Amino acid sequence: MPQRIELTSEPVRKPRSTESSLLRKIQRACRSTLPEPDLGLNLDVADYINSKQGATPREAVLAIEKLVNNGDTQAAVFALSLLDVLVKNCGYSIHLQISRKEFLNDLVKRFPEQPPLRYSKVQQMILEAIEEWYQTICKHASYKDDLQYINDMHKLLKYKGYTFPKVGSENLAVLRPNDQLRTPSELQEEQERAQAAKLEELLRSGKPDDLKEANKLMKIMAGFKDDTKVAVKQAINNELNKLKRKADLFNEMLTSADEPDLENEAIQELYGDLKSAQPKFKKLIEEERDDDALVSNLSKFNDLVIQLLKRYKSIKGMKEEELNVPDTNEPAKELNLIDFDDDTTANTPSVTSPSKSLQPFDDLLGDFNKVSLSSPKSPQENDTVVDILGDAHSKSSGIDLLDFDSQPGESKTALSAYSNSIVLPNGLLNSSSNSKEITAQSQRHILNQSDHLRIDYELTRESMTKLRLVIFYSNISSDPITNFALLVASPKGTTLSLQPQSGNMLQSNSRDGIKQIASVEGISVNLGKPIKLKWKANYCTKGDSKEESGTTSLPTI
């Protein structure tokens, strides 16, 4: 007999959902009402799995598998996008789950025996994912022996006549292991997490052979610190030897010529590797302080790396903030060329009464009352400052983007530290009069480089009064960068137009992960002085909000 609806003295309570927090997060990230895959929601799922571990990787993969095969194309596309984020951010625990035979069979369950003339969107994404796994973790991961079923599925599909799409180099680079130096504690933590994930899967299987393997693994885990101490030291020595070879090559490239080509990609990559590894030396020395020989070698190598970084920066003309070697000859005022948040000091010249004789480029961005923030979606507006992502909080936060803290006559001096870091291209203009055709060569320059973020740009001249910039954003750290946004200001009397960024997330150690095109109108060929741009970058990494800012001088072309 069906239960009647009637009023009672008991309070009405909403029935509790039987779904776990993880499943709710996955459903939210893959719901069909989304216009496109939401990277923020996908990363939220990845962070949840990394924090919980245990059975969550398997639970997530099973939920994604059901969404892929439920018949809803849009939900399947979102589920595969989520799976891609998990594979790239959750490590071995997810890699072990996608290598299970049951998962791979269900993933291709809707593939016909004979390949169709044209693949569906879901089939195309599945083939691309399997090819990406095959080219990266199945070949280069230290645990590649645990991923044999992915190799088998790749061979089977190829035998059936399926063709795999070409995977972009940036996607392959994310999953390939990097050569970054790691401390013993980091190596131990990584190994323990991998062993715990494997033990979880072996116990869940319950097969006799798997239980025997689980018994061996538990013995290894119980005596991990003693049994694998030699292996950990060997891994550290291998990584140090790789770094020493890089340091020798870097030193040779810096000393092989009187004026080394610092724009060379190999030199920049070696510099980035050594710079990111140098802070780890202190941790290694602290953790291995009982090993006198290793500590001595590390101290000597650390001194060598610091000297190489100093030499590179002295050639490049960069400030040595990370190495704590300030330039004592430079006025303190010039060290703070741009400050988006600090109040104006008493020594700062007043901006309310500029001289009448100032030219537009002398009074750089001086008329603050007319400055506004604009979105890159409407580049036709003549706004001087552009908020690349059009964030609402950027437009109302009251930040004074255009306080350069310098008088017009000091513009050249105040930019000396920054302009020295830019190599002025020669022969960019090949014209004897304004009526002749302007030709420009594209050369990459470094706008800024920090511990996490590197910004490069290529500068060309499109017309007698217009410059074009192609800006590249790279992540030089081992942690992903999310919610990336940039604010840029150009001089008064010019018009800065920006196209939208190609994205707002940078995977770890990704080069040119985001690209953007900008143009500055109103820069005459005969100006005769460099133009400076003011910028501020905001992003998140490892859960912390970061902010970088500065001023750069564009080469005269």
Curated annotation (Swiss-Prot):
Keywords: Coiled coil, Golgi apparatus, Phosphoprotein, Protein transport, Transport. The modification Phosphothreonine is found at residue 348. The modification Phosphoserine is found at residues 353, 357, 378, 394. It comes from Saccharomyces cerevisiae (strain ATCC 204508 / S288c) (Baker's yeast). This is ADP-ribosylation factor-binding protein GGA1. Present with 656 molecules/cell in log phase SD medium. Residues 440-556 form the GAE domain. GO terms for cellular component: cytosol; trans-Golgi network. Its main location: Golgi. Residues 29-165 form the VHS domain. SUPFAM superfamilies: Clathrin adaptor appendage domain, ENTH/VHS domain, GAT-like domain. One of its GO terms (biological process) is Golgi to vacuole transport. Residues 192-317 form the GAT domain. One of its GO terms (molecular function) is phosphatidylinositol binding. It is found in: Golgi apparatus, trans-Golgi network. The keyword Coiled coil applies. May play a role in the regulation of membrane traffic through the trans-Golgi network.
